[in-house]
Amino acid sequence: MTVATTVRKAVFPVAGLGTRFLPATKASPKEMLPVVDKPLIQYAVEEAYAAGIRHMIFVTGRSKRAIEDHFDTAYELEAELETAGKEALLALVRSVQPDDMDCAFVRQPRSLGLGHAVLCAEPLVGNEPFAVLLADDLMVGPQGGQPVLAQMVTAFRQQGRSVIAVQEVPEDQVHKYGIVAGEPAGGQLMRIERIVEKPKADVAPSRMGVAGRYILTPGVFDEIRNQPRGVGGEIQLTDGIARLMAHEAVYAFQYEGKRYDCGSKEGFLEATGELALQHPQVGATFRTYLKGLSL
């Protein structure tokens, strides 16, 4: 069967409750928490856009209206900025949703796991390959190089099969990740032979952890739909990918760049601090401030 190798659509599962960040997330989506001057979800959308993707699909839940509003046209705000002659701010606001990008939203009625969230997007994805980006994982590509998802799109075009971003994780963190093992397939690729969701360190097949970026072929939908519930009683995306491997190759991709685990407070603070230092407007001032601290 010929598999399309153009990735046109990206799925963003954003229905989670964000309990680690309470009370900040009591009424606001965790994906809208700002890292310097942009909400977390915007970094993921910009990464998808930079990879050539123009159709963004958000799988949402209750209390997520702010995400829809953020990626909508703010007519009143734009009019006020235009009247005030604030052209730079107006351009910044409009850049959130470029003219050639469209956004669609679908509800995940119950929190049944990441696999279920991806399955909720099937009617909008259709029978074509698609990307999945977890906003909790803020990915920064190498300086002067491609963003992480763009690297993966290149690998997918070469292989025509599902590609999953991976990184080596510390042994004491293995139980927090989907873990893969397999055989080298050239360059940064490994053909996956085993994938396990959140194993204990002593039984994990490796220390290569899945890093929140996927490019998947549409065959994964049937596998998710027909699988039993897995770890935590949830419908796991990892289990669907494991079932897909019985029918077609799936590759792990060791990306170039850095991942910030913004699902944790520590990772969120690391991202905020390091991206603030790189920010063209506040970086120098912030660096001076940090040097003056008595740590």
Please name every model-derived segment.
Residues M1-T6, T288-L295:
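Basic/polar N-terminal segments that are highly enriched at the extreme N-terminus
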Residues T2-K86, G144-A150:
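N-terminal glycine-rich phosphate-binding loop and ensuing alpha1 helix
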Residues K9, R54-M56, D102, P129, ...:
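Residues at the starts of beta-strands that form the adenosine-phosphate
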Residues M32, C103-F105, S162-I164, V250-A252, ...:
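Conserved beta-strand scaffold positions in the cores of enzyme catalytic domains, especially
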Residues L40-Y43, H116-C120, G240:
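Well-ordered alpha-helical segments embedded in enzymatic catalytic cores
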Residues A131, Q143-P147, V153-R157, P184-R287:
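Catalytic-core segments of class I nucleotidyltransferases/pyrophosphorylases
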